[in-house]
Amino acid sequence: MNRAETGHRGEAAAARWYQKQGCRLLAHNFHTRMGELDVVVQEPDGTIVICEVKTRSSDAVSRPAAAVNAAKQKRLILAAQHYLQCTGQSDAPVRFDVAEVFPDRKSVV
C-alpha cells in the first residue's frame, strides 16, 4: 500500500470513528488554495470539527500529531475559514482535532 492509499484509509477510519460518536460527516478532503481539510464533521450540539488525520505505522519514531507544526496549523486555520465561509457556517462553534490512526493496531486516537 502506498502513502496516498494509507492516508485515504486513515481518513476513512477517522470519519467512521466520528460517525460512530454521533457526528455528521460534512466534508472529506475539502480542497482550497490554502490547503486541504481531511475530515469535517458536525457534532450533535452543532460544533464543527475540523480534523487533520495522520496515519502512521506503530513503529514510527514520533507521534503522528507531531507533524502538525505551526505552519500546518496556520494553513488549517485558513482552509477552515474558507470552508466555513463557503458553507455559510462562519458563526458556528469550531474545534480542531488531530486524529492519529495506526492501521496495524486497528485504532484511531
Q: Would you name each region that the model predicts?
A:
Residues 1-28:
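Acidic-basic catalytic patches of nuclease active cores, encompassing PD-(D/E)XK
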Residues 18, 37-60, 68, 76:
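Conserved catalytic cores of phosphodiester-cleaving nucleases, focusing on short active-site segments
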Residues 22, 33-37, 94:
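Short beta-strand or tight-loop elements
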Residues 24, 48-50, 93:
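Hydrophobic "anchor" residues on beta-strands that sit immediately upstream
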Residues 27-31, 99-102:
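Short, solvent-exposed loop/turn elements at beta->coil junctions and helix N-caps
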Residues 32, 43, 104:
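Acidic surface patches and DE-rich sequence motifs
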Residues 55-104:
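Catalytic cores of nucleic-acid endonucleases
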Residues 108-109:
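Conserved small/polar residues in nucleotide/adenosyl-binding loops
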